[in-house]
A protein has these predicted regions:
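Active-site metal-binding core of divalent-cation-utilizing nuclease and nuclease-like domains
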Residues: 81, 98-134, 144
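Short, amphipathic alpha-helical interaction segments positioned at domain boundaries
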Residues: 75-100
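Alpha-helix termini
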Residues: 35-39, 100, 127-130, 158-169
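Hydrophobic, Leu/Ile/Phe/Ala-enriched alpha-helical segments that form helix-helix packing faces
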Residues: 16, 32, 51-58, 92-100, ...
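Catalytic cores of nucleic-acid endonucleases
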Residues: 140-191
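Charged, structured surface patches that assemble and position nucleic-acid processing machinery
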Residues: 188-210
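Nuclease-adjacent, charged terminal/linker segments that flank catalytic cores
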Residues: 1-79
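Conserved catalytic cores of phosphodiester-cleaving nucleases, focusing on short active-site segments
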Residues: 92, 119-160
Length: 210
């Protein structure tokens, strides 16, 4: 595999397989091939070329969205259903990569705390920034506002005295991000609010420089 594919190709394959996420060629270019490219157009061309190789070797599959006629790439036995939530998550992590956040892993519909806290964030994102490990609990609410204030408040309150929770969600290393068009107004917790059109995406990086 390594003799035929590049190390970047292997990262693409592993990422798609581990996350069950779908990405288009432009997004894959920005996340995985931007260091080799001059600009977004160049990274897209590189990604398209490498993805063709991965498809020819049957490591990756693709399907076309009838709504926008784009190809989306995935690994799995069934063609995944394209939902607004999944598209928002794919674009969110792409924006992260563009802002020099180093993606480590993405877990969709993360259920680690579902039993005890009735929480299932749309994505649990592990990443590095300035060589430090961080985590995002991502809540996508395309048609409503953030609604899990009390549940997250209990989880983060319990975390203060629970080493078990801290092993999963280290202190001062976790952000709750509310991806929706309605600004979150809470008194107990403070999610980072990102609009669905990503026009205020700079708010994420601001959390690391303020």
């Amino acid at each position: 595999m390594a003799s035929i594919l590049t190390s970047r190709d292997v990262k693409v394959i592993n990422f798609l397989e581990d996350s069950n996420i779908v990405l288009n060629a432009a997004q894959i270019g920005k996340i995985f091939y931007s260091e080799q490219a001059r600009d977004d157009k160049s990274s897209l061309k590189i990604a398209q070329k490498r993805l063709k190789k991965m498809i020819d070797l049957k490591y990756v599959k693709r399907f076309r969205s009838y709504s926008n006629q784009q190809y989306y790439y995935f690994i799995g036995s069934k063609v995944p259903k394209l939902t607004e939530h999944k598209l928002l998550i794919s674009e969110f992590i792409t924006r992260m990569a563009e802002d020099n956040f180093e993606l480590e892993s993405v877990k969709l519909e993360w259920t680690h705390f579902q039993k005890d806290y009735h929480l299932r964030p749309d994505a649990f994102i592990s990443f590095k920034y300035l060589s430090h490990n961080f985590y995002i609990l991502l809540e996508c609410d395309s048609s409503k506002k953030f609604t899990n204030e009390d549940k997250y408040y209990k989880l983060f309150t319990d975390r203060k005295n629970s080493l078990e929770i801290q092993e999963v969600l280290p202190l001062k290393r976790v952000l709750i991000v509310s991806l929706c068009d309605v600004k979150t107004e809470t008194s107990k917790i403070t999610p980072v609010w990102i609009k669905n059109d990503f026009s205020n995406f700079s708010q994420l990086k601001y959390q690391f420089v303020k």
